[in-house]
Amino acid sequence: VTKWDWEACMTVPENQWGYHKDWSLSYVKTPIEVIDRIVHAVSMGGNMVVNFGPQPDGDFRSEEKELAMALGCWMKRYGECIYGCDYAGWDKQDWGYYTRKGQEVYMVVFNRPYSGLLKVKVPKGTEIERAVLPDGQVVKVTETARNEYNVAMPSQDPGEPFIIKLQVKEASGATDGYRDALT
């Protein structure tokens, strides 16, 4: 994370910029991998450029078209966690990434824990007021310790990375209901 603007660029097949006739020489990224890299870049305050190499006739390979369609479908459902978002300033968790737009922090979940609970550590003085899915369904949030919460996952597995939008409140010099241990 840096205060300067930055951008990452990636190719769909590894190390093949522009058009290459033979894709068998390298690994071709899946839609989930490309989404992960885009979200990762935004979560660190950056931008991601995905390279598609047009064929000599100007058309794209069917694989690239399918990838673009998958990315477009995901962005249509969850693009609010990307467009206009930036670094959230929260510690990354094993389940995915955070992005932020104003007082809304987006949890972008790639890995569903078996417990069905997403552990969230918030910066000091930050409270989670509400958690909702993109369809407006409210998600249960339980404070478990100082600056730590459990956020329940939706019962239905969407089968793809999904988002939970957190509405947060930040207070300067706030005190909480916890007391430090006396030693």
What name fits each language-model region?
Residues 1-183:
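Mature catalytic domains of secreted/periplasmic carbohydrate-active enzymes
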